[in-house]
Amino acid sequence: MEELNELEKAILSKLSVKYPAIQEHMPFLRVLNREITGVGMYVNFCYVKDPQVSIPCLEISDGCISTNENIEIQGLKYGIGYEVDVSDGKIKFIEFITYGEEWDGVIKDYRFI
């Protein structure tokens, strides 16, 4: 398990504007794995437990949430889109998708547009 990278944290921070409880989940999220699909990537999460802290359930219906922004990434002409999957009150994964371009999952410079 590893810490979230800068982009993953930025996405969750942006979503926390509409869904503030996400901020309470972020300290406990770790990356379980990153699955490269060739035209996208899944970043699967798990939670680390702290017996002293109770993480509130996200009051978000099961499904996917997004800010509907695109992300410009160095090396991709059309950038990427993303959705965050929420199930059972927890953040399960981020799905990144390209718009038909091959992608190795490497994130160098990026910006939200």
Language model features with spans:
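N-terminal domain-onset segments
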Residues: 1-64, 70, 106-113
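Short, compact, well-ordered microdomains
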Residues: 73-113
